[in-house]
Amino acid sequence: MTLYEELQARGLVAQITDNEIIDLINNGKATFYIGFDCTADSLTAGHFMALTLMKRLQMAGNKPIALIGGGTTMIGDPSGRTDMRKMLTKEDIAHNAACFKKQMEKFIDFSDDKALMLNNADWLLNLNYVELLRDVGACFSVNNMLRAKCYEQRMERGLSFLEFNYMIMQSYDFYYMFQHYGCNMQFGGDDQWSNMLGGTELIRRKLGKDAYAMTITLLTDSQGKKMGKTAGNAVWLDPNKTSPFEFYQYWRNVGDADVMKCIRMLTFLPLEQIDEMSTWKDQRLNEAKEILAYELTSMVHGKEEAERAQAAARALFGGAAMDTEHMPSTQLTEADLTDGSIGILTLMVKAGLAASNGEARRLVVQGGVLADGEKVAAPTVSFTAEQLKKGVVIKKGKKVYHKVTL
């Protein structure tokens, strides 16, 4: 099986600009890039598709370029957005880029020039605006840009001229790297298709040469929602933002309808093994979820942390003695207490178990909250400083555990 055939079998290929792509990646002749706008100081589970794709392609002899969007982050990509992104300072972007590289090195081998990490601020921030309009802007049709899917959602709410330039900036990235780094391919999410076509067309018009683009399938659940968030919050690759246990539990709790799709798209397990697992039903689906969670946690946090997270999860949900060492936790201070105690509703909000007192109240009234194994009888229940110093384990629903201490 060729690399391209494997990518298809794993459900990763969405669109390609040209069949020439197949020969390039199969023969290890692609120098390709994927862009990462550094809008936070950590990558998320939503970046998994891109990171694992880069690893697969590099293993086949292709050369990855991880492009940090130091310049484009200052504009903000409107793709898939209904509002304008927060503007970041140069210092914020530099810090975020450094954090990204550390995490990417777990997937990509940057040694001996096997891969590059570039920052488009190095060329975008030095551009002369008049020259850009004359040399690059002339290659773009405003009519075509307005028809692009990435701008559709923003037109009614208002699209700033700043964001309207994003397609030109991304296209210029490809054009610049084609000339200076031999980059002949771009990969990205399926929502980036219009921006990517802009780059291949700019290279064709300015240089008379061919460049290629392929979009990868967006990772969505059976309801069509993007995966990589829990309770509205991102699942981070940084262990200080999302602990290895929480990370493990996110993947352990994916829906029955989504587990095999995630295994196929995100792990490096052989396709033959995955095909066999696809026949699993009922309780064996839980085994598949454990495999998924272990494989991904191992990739991000290492085998030791994956084993510890798996052991802790089995102890929590398997009826064994409770292991709270790796459980998500919140440490309160005396300032969080009122007259030496804290109510269950306030505690749940501070621990991130509920978005508001109202939501916490509803969960308690419905009987979905336990404290140290006992059902919380009423929304008026409170915990003393003495109890909190020993640690209180809150259970929400069937699978969410959280330790609160003082």
Q: Model-derived features: where do they sit?
A:
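Divalent-metal (Mg2+/Mn2+/Ca2+)-assisted nucleotide/phosphate chemistry catalytic cores
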Residues: 10, 89-90, 96-217, 221
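N-terminal catalytic cores of NTP/NDP-binding nucleotidyl/phosphoryl-transfer enzymes
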Residues: 21-78, 186-193
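Divalent metal-coordination and catalytic microenvironments
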Residues: 7, 44, 117
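A charged helix-plus-loop insertion that forms the helical arch/lid used to bind
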Residues: 78-94
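Buried hydrophobic packing segments
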Residues: 50-57, 177, 195-203, 296, ...
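Positively charged, low-complexity intrinsically disordered leader regions
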Residues: 1-32
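Short acidic, glycine/serine/threonine-rich loops at helix termini
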Residues: 76-80, 127-133, 225-231
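Conserved nucleotide- and phosphate/pyrophosphate-binding catalytic cores
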Residues: 203-406
